[in-house]
Amino acid sequence: MKLDLKNMGLVLEGGGMRGVFTCGVLDYFMDHHIEFPYGIGVSAGACNGLSYMSHQRGRAKYSNIDMMAKYHYIGLKYLWYQHSILDQKLLYEIFPEELLPYDYQAYYENPARFEMVTTNCMTGRACYLEEKKDKERLLAIAKASSSLPYVCPITYVDGRPMLDGGIVDSIPVLRAIEQGYERNVVVLTRNRGYRKSEKDIRVPRFIYTRYPRLRVVLSRRCQVYNQQLEMIERMEDEGRIIAIRPEQRVVVNRIE
């Protein structure tokens, strides 16, 4: 079956280190010159998608595997002096500028649109942001999209407090449809049939006290994610999307 890529969107789920699966898929797309006019990514999917949109094959894999092995950029030690479980200085300053420079010009000149999903802490709703001119804003959006709740500081974009987009929209296929792409390729990082435990999550009273709507969506994120998974499987069965996912459970933690 030949795909009409001119009218298809690309949706990239997050998932932290499970995103190495996405890296392989995107490198395959680049090897075969498969390009989409529109893409949208969440958290790790946003970061990996940026390298795809700048046509830098292997860059996302390097950041997820090689750079992790060399620099060990995830750990409790970073909470001490960066207030984050991730070495955000390495990831969003040193890596894109020095270790494996991001090709901003190639990204800017790519006619395809690319949106990244964040969660607005004030409203508890998803924000869909894109940037093709301002390097600092682009990095801020990517950082916000990947700022895990509880273990990463809030990131400000356009003066608004933001956290990981996966809190409210982990698989933003409906956003792609709203943007005019009725058919989509959806790259997932969980096997078909996976569901999260829907135990009630009680957000400690002393956390995010300034953001009551954020607290509400954090308490419901498992239910919302499971609803999205059910929708994705239904749309796949109906032939409305092409889902690319691991065949078996990925045995790796989100931040392992």
PLM regions and their residue ranges:
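Patatin-like phospholipase
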Residues: 1-42, 50-256
